[in-house]
Amino acid sequence: MLRFIYVILGNLHRIWMIPTMGYYARHPEKYSEKFRYEYDRHCITIMKKRGRITTNAYGVGNLPKDGGYVMFANHQGKYDALGIMDSHNNPCSIVMDADRSYMPLVKQFIDLVQGKRIKLDDLRQAAGIISEVSEEVKQGWKFIIFPSGGYEHRNGNYVDPFKPGCFKGAIRAKAPIVPVAIVNSWKVFDLWSLRRVVTQVFYLKPMFYDEYKDMKSNAISDLVYKRICSAVRCAEEGDFKAAVLK
């Protein structure tokens, strides 16, 4: 949290960017998806520079070249989605816990990419969001989903259990599933320190529909979970090349 406060105070002279983000988000008819996404990434770059944050991405070449897909990542903290967007050149959106999505800056980041807010305690609403994601992925949209449903504030690269229901949107869309392993992202805002921090994002080999069409959502969830856990372990051991191959 110290770094978050430091970033905010260090960018007070850019406070005008917050209402600007809100304006762009409210007028998608004027500002293209690409424009709004790049403005989000511009804000992320400013935050990284002030916050002394470096994010290295591996396996970017694994991302499908055409059409929509869903990235499923482990969840460590507030920086996770920003770390992915920082290295993901094509516009993508996010499905996020509604309760965490209205914090200052978080709201603006989510709105700019037309993110989906999911109520974890409302099954009917959650099912509706998954259906929306499915339809939009069919149209070529790309989404980030954190299938653990949330995160705990604790120091370490923990990978919390995944909720199989989170995979149903990708399954219905018959879309590629891209496992994403996030490493050391928790250090950005959970460490009470301003020392330079380096995080990693690993894009693993995607699972295409033909590979998982005969699998249940539970089995898909377990497989993605195991692959991400293996990648995180390799990364902690410093073997980044092996991590991408998981």
Q: What residue spans do the PLM features occupy?
A:
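Short acidic-hydrophobic, aromatic-tinged amphipathic segments that line or gate anion-handling sites
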Residues: 57, 116-120, 209
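Structural motif
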Residues: 123-131
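Catalytic core of membrane glycerolipid acyltransferases/transacylases, capturing the structured
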Residues: 18-23, 36, 65-123
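A generic structural signal for well-ordered alpha-helical segments
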Residues: 47-48, 110, 136, 170
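Non-catalytic C-terminal accessory region of glycerolipid acyltransferases
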Residues: 130-246
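Soluble or luminal CAZymes and related metallo-dependent hydrolases
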Residues: 35-39, 76, 125, 216, ...
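Membrane-anchoring hydrophobic helices of lipid-metabolizing enzymes
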Residues: 1-69, 83
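Positions that flank functional sites
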Residues: 63, 125, 185
